[in-house]
Amino acid sequence: MRSVVIGGGAIGTLIARQLSRFEGEVILIEKREDLGQGITKANSAIIHGGYDDPPASLRGKLCARGNELYDGLARELKVPVKRIGSIVVARNEEEFKKLEELLVNGQANGVRDLRILGREELHVLEPAISSEFNYALYCGSAGITEPWMVAIAASI
């Protein structure tokens, strides 16, 4: 079997890597001079927690699971991952309701280390944050990586 993957960014190289584990030829086509030079280079580098997507959606089902798998992938590829966490802030009760919705989504999606912080805990976690913020959804499993390094490492 012959497989052709178009795009040598993080996603394309990871797909090609996975396909190469099976019998057959894998061809990776990239239009730029090097891997990871397109969208991957401009990527925010965030490893999303998985709380934003509705549980019934495909992305909702896969985002939290992908987050869990990322540490193993990073070890395999020898690329950095920092679990720095993320926060979504709210000023008032109306915005707080949105945090509660995100919490319910995240729990249904299986997101680890997800909770709502009150004002005091939020300002201890982020001392420089504006005093107008009273609540936050904290996701400790969110992290960052180096997407272009993922693309290069996955291609080796």
Give short role names for the model-derived ranges.
Residues 15, 70, 102, 153-154:
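Aromatic/hydrophobic pocket-lining residues that form π-stacking "cages" and hydrophobic walls in ligand
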